[in-house]
Swiss-Prot record:
Principal location class: membrane
Organism of derivation: Homo sapiens
Record's keyword annotation contains Cytoplasm: no
Protein name as it appears in the record: Transmembrane protein 278
Location(s), subcellular: Membrane
Protein origin, superkingdom: Eukaryota
Ranges annotated as spanning the membrane: 51-71, 105-125
One Gene Ontology term, aspect cellular component: plasma membrane
Record keywords, A-Z: Membrane, Transmembrane, Transmembrane helix
Chain intervals with Pro residues compositional bias: 136-148
GO terms, biological process: negative regulation of canonical Wnt signaling pathway
Amino acid sequence: MSEQGRETEEEEGGGGASDTAPMLPRGPPDHQASALTCPGWSGPPLLPGRLLAGLLLHLLLPAAAFLLVLLPAAAVVYLGFLCHSRVHPAPGPRCRALFSDRGSAALIVFGLLSLPPLLVLASAVRARLARRLRPLLPPPAGTPGPRRPPGRPDEDEQLCAWV
């Protein structure tokens, strides 16, 4: 190619790139090609730990939150049934001294009526704990999140993509 042709190509924005240059960046080397590798995680050796952490976050965390919040209502309902004469024909002396049948029925009703607000509270507790513990887990493999440029405020969400 002549010198004039090179100058014309550089002026047009060619910048030395040829038609055979790859348009997309090259993929990672084979040892990094696993979908399980994330920054800070070494991939396949930590797969059982990652699965266990996901199990704890998604199964045991809600169970613990709901149990902790709903336990008082369950105890009140249990005490109401324990001291009612139709459930136990001969309630213990403590129950007879503390509650009549009307008092036991009131405990049962109070415990059952307190369940819906406590369910909402338990759901909020579970959501907040899950949100706080989410950074401890790596993102799911194969689902990249939106990228935001560092240092930009969240006023206008701008999605960045490689072009």
